[in-house]
Amino acid sequence: MQQSSELFFASSNNHKFEEAQRILSNLGLEINMFKTTLEEIQSNSMNEIAKRKALDAFRKIKKPVIIEDDGLFIESLDGFPGPYSSYVYDTIGNKGIMRLLENIETRNAKFVAIIAYCNGDDDVQLFESSIPGKISLSIEEGGWGYDPIFIPDGESKTYANVSDKDKFSHRSASLKKFSDWFMHTQLDSGL
């Protein structure tokens, strides 16, 4: 098992860290939080945003680090807010998203998550997953971020109210891809 002092999760978001820690721990990988505010470039490319954040995090901590970036892509809004999800949430929130979707029947959406790993060189590894779903008709209680309005396919409740979000969330799927790669890489390098 990877020692917790050797791998860090960089974020200013405690919710993201707690979710990542819980998921990775269940996969046999321990992480520590590196609480920091990372450079958040504005780009149409989530990959570019994730790479820049991972490089920024490594420059600050000088240790192997992962970051997570995600976006909510709403079909009827041409993928908006997409890579601008964090900014949009901070400015208009879930109420603003619901106003944009007033009188719109097609509420299909997907959540995309990217885990980016950097260990010092400029070769950032990316692990992406997406979960299809739809936007609810109302804002549910609980959860954080867009959880109260996103209903994953096959569910009748939003992320905020499903019993085990970790089993099928976009973040969980990306973290699993990262964990599989990281554990395999560690075994290959003899660490």
Region spans (language model):
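Anionic-ligand binding patches
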Residues: 2-8, 15-191
